[in-house]
Each structure stands twice: as C-alpha cells, then as structure tokens.
Amino acid sequence: MMVYEISLGSGSGRKRSESKEVVTLNSKSVRKIFIVVLAIKPHNFTLEFEQEGEKVKTRKVAFVTGASRGIGRACAVALAQAGYDVAVSARTMIDGTAFLDDGVTPVPGGLDTTVDQIRAAGQEGHPIQMDLLDRDSVIHAADEAIEHFGRIDVLVNNAIYQGPGAMLTIEELDDTNLKQLFEGNVFAQLGLIRHLLPVFIEQGGATIVNMISATAFINPSEKIGSGGWGVGYAMSKSAFERVAPLLMVEHGDE
C-alpha cells in the first residue's frame, strides 16, 4: 500500500520523508497532479487473474472526494484520462443547486458535470452524495463506491470543510468552530481510511492520496485578510499531514 500527500501552494515538489512523496503544485497545475502520482507509484493496478484458463484484466477504480468542482474535479478527470473508472463524492449532486452562505450567490459545479467529463474520457463515473460533517454519510459513500465497482485502487482524500471558523483569529475562534474544522479536515478523512483499510488489505493493496495544504508546515507572513490564514484551519491541516507517514509505516508493506 502506498500513501502520498499532495500539497497545494507555491513552490516546487519536494520529498519530505522516505515514506511518502509530497508534490507541491500551483493551483493552475492541478490537472497534472495525477500524471505525477501515477508516474511515481510502484505499480499501475492493471490486475490479472485466471478465469477458465484465460487471463482477465480487472478494472482500475478510483474514489475522489470533494469532486463537484475545482481540484477534486480535475483529479477525477485526470484519473479517468489515465484509464480509471471513478466514484466521486460531494454535497452538490446537480450543477447550479449550491449557494454561498447568503443563499443567493450560486456556486458553480456539481457531480453531474464531473461524471459527464469522466464519461467523455471513456470511463465510468458514479456520483455519491457525501457530507464530511455527517460520519454516517462518509461511511455510506465508501460502501456505495465498493458496492458499485467492487474495489477501490486509488483513494483521493480531497474534500475539506469549508465553513465558519477557517479564517478566524485565535481570539475569535471558539470550540464549536474548531471541532467542525477537525471533523471536516481530519476525523472524516481518517474515518474513511480506517473504514476502507480492511478492503485495501484484502484486495492486495491500494494507493491513498491525501490532499493537504502548505499551511500545515509553513508560517503565514501576514495576518488574516492580508494573505494569512486562520489558526484552526492550519491546526487541522497540520494534524491531517501526520496521517500519511504513520499509515505508510503501519501498512506500507501490505
């Protein structure tokens, strides 16, 4: 089992430890992310098994969370272009039905349009509604992906919590905001990994890609509103950054 982190921010890719690769990319380069990841992982998951004396290739399947728009959509499409069928999850199923907190300003993107792009790449896409703050929803999404495709070869933990608390100062941040940030940026993703680990081990391995942020390991040069970020967001991303190396130590040989 291989575990990778991809950090979105400025700077070039760099290896941060022997147990994982961290690829740092500008957000404009997200469509190249999985060209990099698929190139450096040790096997390509083109699996074969014997059936009545003939070798039969199995499908390659990826599960990308937070794929209704932006980085998640770009990852899902890149994987489809690399030959993967892709299960995609997000809160927004239909493009044009999501709005900002004001309830008026629309947010473009939905799983329906992501699946259209996956199919345009010649692969099967399967949309699943998922809310990071609802643990039952997260587990259901994993189960539905497995039920539909039969396996998951690549898990991309891209979805993050985007809501109150992310851009608050230390003085402004309260426990409720902090708990939401950790549920949506750490606990949900870790819960998804833990739920799928037995599946990955039984099927003989998988590749896990954790999307993190440069806020996990660098200090802001300015305050919030001038290029800086909230302490709660940075704390949650830093906590999630610790998952990959430990996961690699515990299960890297499986």
Region spans (language model):
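Rossmann-fold scaffold of SDR-type NAD(P)-dependent oxidoreductases
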Residues: 65, 130, 152-162, 185, ...
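Amphipathic alpha-helical dimer-interface segment in Rossmann-like NAD(P)H-dependent oxidoreductases
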Residues: 147, 184-202, 216, 248-253
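Catalytic Tyr-X3-Lys loop
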Residues: 153, 171-190, 205, 209, ...
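Catalytic loop of short-chain dehydrogenase/reductase
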Residues: 161-162, 175, 207-253
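Short-chain dehydrogenase/reductase
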Residues: 49-149, 163-169, 173
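Conserved Rossmann-fold SDR core element
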Residues: 79, 86, 151-153, 241-244, ...
